[in-house]
UniProtKB/Swiss-Prot annotation:
This is Peptidyl-tRNA hydrolase. The record marks 91 as: Stabilizes the basic form of H active site to accept a proton. It comes from Alkaliphilus oremlandii (strain OhILAs) (Clostridium oremlandii (strain OhILAs)). The active site is at residue 19. The record marks 9 as: Discriminates between blocked and unblocked aminoacyl-tRNA. GO terms for biological process: protein quality control for misfolded or incompletely synthesized proteins; rescue of stalled ribosome.
Length: 185
């Protein structure tokens, strides 16, 4: 089983914000694969299904971003999943808007949701897909990531969510190396 986690903050006021692009990626993946992500368990909205004949659990933690590790730790302990079968999708301000960076493992960088996950799982040895949301030229970083995409960036981000979904599907079916080669940008 693969655990596919999109990071974000719960609540309507955070819908469609840069920081919730991980949730949006899960929504797109769920739609493409006819999986309902509605069941509340393990402090997350979850949906079980298959991708390319492989069992997956799609997850949107409901703990707020900086505590995402609490939800994922619950899930990993319950399902006894190898960290290599976890995929985390999240926003990254250090990558240009619309760019994907897929890695097999690594540090959290500046992302507090990833810091929580790595700290509580006690490993950074799991795949992740960073979705570029760009960086503000000026102003407060928190306001920027909790803000929405401007109209002119929305088509780019919709296409990016489509590619992120395809990257996850490829990773589940064909492995991380194939996904990295095909979708890293």
């Amino acid at each position: 089983m693969h655990i596919i986690v999109g990071l974000g903050n719960p609540g309507k006021k955070y819908d469609a914000t840069r920081h919730n692009i991980g949730f949006e990626a899960i929504d797109m993946l769920a739609k493409r694969n006819n999986i309902e992500v509605k069941k509340l368990k393990h402090k997350a909205l979850c949906g079980e299904g298959t991708i390319g004949g492989n069992k997956v659990l799609l997850v949107k933690p409901q703990t707020f971003m900086n505590l995402s590790g609490q939800s994922l730790l619950d899930i990993v302990q319950f399902y006894k999943v190898d960290p290599k079968n976890i995929v985390v999708l999240y926003d990254d301000i250090d990558i240009p808007v619309g760019t994907l960076r897929i890695r097999e493992k690594g540090s959290s960088g500046t992302h507090n949701g990833m810091k929580s996950i790595i700290y509580l799982l006690q490993t950074d040895q799991f795949p992740r897909i960073r979705i570029g949301v760009g960086k503000p030229q000026f102003g407060d970083l928190a306001d920027y990531v909790l803000g929405r995409f401007p109209k002119e960036e929305i088509p780019t981000m919709l296409e990016t969510l489509e590619r992120a979904s395809q990257a996850v599907e490829t990773l589940v079916k064909d492995g991380i190396a194939v996904s990295m080669n095909r979708y890293n940008g």
